[in-house]
Amino acid sequence: MKKAIILAIGNELVEGLIVDTNSKYLAQRLKEFGYYIVRTETLPDNFDIMVLRIKEAIKDADLIITSGGLGPTEDDLTREAVAHSIGRKLLKNEAIAQELINRAIKYYGKAPESVVKQAFVIENAEVIDNKVGTAPGQMLKYDGKIIILLPGPPVELIPMFESILEKLKTNDSLYTRRIKTIGIPEAVLMDEYKDILYSNSRITIATMASYERGVEVRFTGPIEIKDEIDYVVNTLLPKLGESVYALDDKEMHDVVYELLVKNNYTVSFAESCTGGLISSTFVDIPGVSSVFKGSVVAYSNEAKIEILGVSKETIEKFGAVSEECVIEMAQGAKKIFNSNFSVAVSGIAGPSGGSEKKPVGTVCIAVCSPNGINSATYNLRGDRQMIRKRSTLIAFDMLRRGIIKCQG
């Protein structure tokens, strides 16, 4: 199996100002194509350190990928560091330079001298076109190894890497299936279904538990045992039932969208503690306007009363964080938007605002459907962002289950 090393470059990564999502993406994609990931590293914009780690990576792996450091500023040193590490020249590509100058003039009225820095290509390197940003990538061979230079912004890196991925195929390509679940603890899942999970020694089983996304079970093996992996997955699925919310690359909101489209249903949201996160997550899906009527972010009690029609007496008697309140919020949203389904969420995301009866993490959710209303109260853990994200996942899950019941 060929080995790969990923080097994420940038002071902003080392200092924790930006989260490195590129390495996660690259590692996952490379693993699917049969690469063993030796390591991922985060390096500062320091020429000597970069050269040292690049040379070590060349010794240890067949494929080295760098992300970041291809911009026009003085601290963008990846081109220089790679060229120095392998003893090759940097050559100015006149066509790229002119294109960068023309683009700068078009958008900014002038072209700073620094913009041309991005036109320098390592000797004998293939240019990887950047259709989103300005910094082109590079791919080259050295001493039987492949070195790839990619820009840092994920919106640029991902399509550029996908465009060259076929060139990196190995004879060790892997096949992976994923089952995504909610409502069943990782330990319970692995214990109760271990006979199915470990029925084939050629399949590697891995689980990933996330408070924000549930439990994912990953099945991986050589491409030639694809049918065997599918058999294990298909054997397990009926056992897990509605706990399975998605397979492979799909997310919870994707599944909800597909169910709504399939049944010609529409939905609306009334959000309090999630602050629009449910709606924002949903509209990430292209074409969602066909099923999404709208939403109300009613954070204050006044907004809940005046916009959604929650009775003042309900809030005074039960509180804004109560099933009684979210039921009326859901009914109000359904009426306002004339949707088939509506979902309402109200909770205490923290860090303050909790009490002995309703501690931080108390979240109430209601789903209004053609069949009636379903509501529940959850006691969630974590910080403010985790509680909001978990509430969003649970809200979509309650909606998913509600749609399934309505369709028979």
Swiss-Prot record:
SMART domains, A to Z: MoCF_biosynth
Pfam families for this protein: CinA, MoCF_biosynth
Coiled-coil residue spans: none
InterPro entries assigned: CinA (IPR050101), CinA-like_C (IPR036653), CinA_C (IPR008136), Competence-induced_CinA (IPR008135), MoaB/Mog-like_dom_sf (IPR036425), MoaB/Mog_dom (IPR001453)
Family under the similarity heading: Belongs to the CinA family.
NCBIfam families recorded: cinA_nterm, molyb_syn, PncC_domain, PRK00549.1
Designated name of the protein: CinA-like protein
Organism listed in the record: Fervidobacterium nodosum (strain ATCC 35602 / DSM 5306 / Rt17-B1)
